Regions:
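Conserved beta-strand signature within the Rossmann-like core of class I S-adenosyl-L-methionine
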Residues: 125-132
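Conserved SAM-binding loop of SAM-dependent methyltransferases across substrates and taxa
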Residues: 29-41
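S-adenosyl-L-methionine
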Residues: 1-19, 31
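Conserved SAM-binding loop
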Residues: 57-58
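A short acidic, Gly/Pro-enriched loop at the edge of an enzyme's catalytic core
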Residues: 81-90
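Mobile active-site "lid"/loop adjacent to the S-adenosyl-L-methionine
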Residues: 92-113
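Conserved SAM-binding motif I beta-strand of class I
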Residues: 43-48
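Conserved SAM-binding strand-loop segment of SAM-dependent methyltransferases
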Residues: 65-76
Length: 160
């Protein structure tokens, strides 16, 4: 049910907005990048630390013009080295690469750095879309780190 809700909300977001530059901070098998390319005219820069993710995503994305996306074999915590402009959409879909070693998961420390970079790089009015899966080894710690980051960020930067 969580996956369905994520996908439903994400697709509606893509269909209802005119994004021009997206970042897929956690490429995985390329599903989010595929959706961004399919439902928007955006260019996408996507990151993953596993070569297997890049290879499977290249296969999935072959129907799209290669000029519309860059797949980068590097951590999302280094995204500021690669961004050419301020993105108006940044997507995180944390956990592990389906069909691969479940011990290779999103690291809480690099995730925090990537979120900090995302907040600074995001175009005004842009969207950070974040999905966090739980249940795999290390997911609780990842969730705790993310919760702390978000609470501190909201407290420092947002007024209600």
């Amino acid at each position: 049910m969580i996956s369905y809700n994520f996908k439903h909300i994400f697709l509606n977001l893509l269909k209802e907005n005119n994004f021009s530059y997206g970042v897929d901070a956690t490429l995985g098998n390329g599903n989010d990048t595929y959706s961004i390319l399919k439902y928007t005219d955006a260019h996408v820069t996507a990151f993953d630390i596993q070569e297997m993710a890049i290879e499977s995503s290249l296969e999935k994305l072959k129907t799209f013009n290669r000029d519309r996306y860059n797949l980068i074999l590097d951590s999302h915590s280094n995204m500021d080295r690669y961004l050419k402009d301020s993105p108006d959409l940044i997507v995180f879909n944390t956990g592990y690469l389906p069909g691969s070693d479940k011990k290779i998961i999103t690291d809480g420390q690099t995730l925090t750095k990537a979120l900090e970079i995302s907040v600074e790089a995001l175009k005004p009015g842009g969207v950070i879309f974040f999905a966090q899966y739980i249940g795999h080894e290390g997911s609780f710690e990842e969730s705790e780190i993310t919760d702390v980051f978000l609470k501190i960020y909201v407290k420092r930067n947002l007024e209600f």
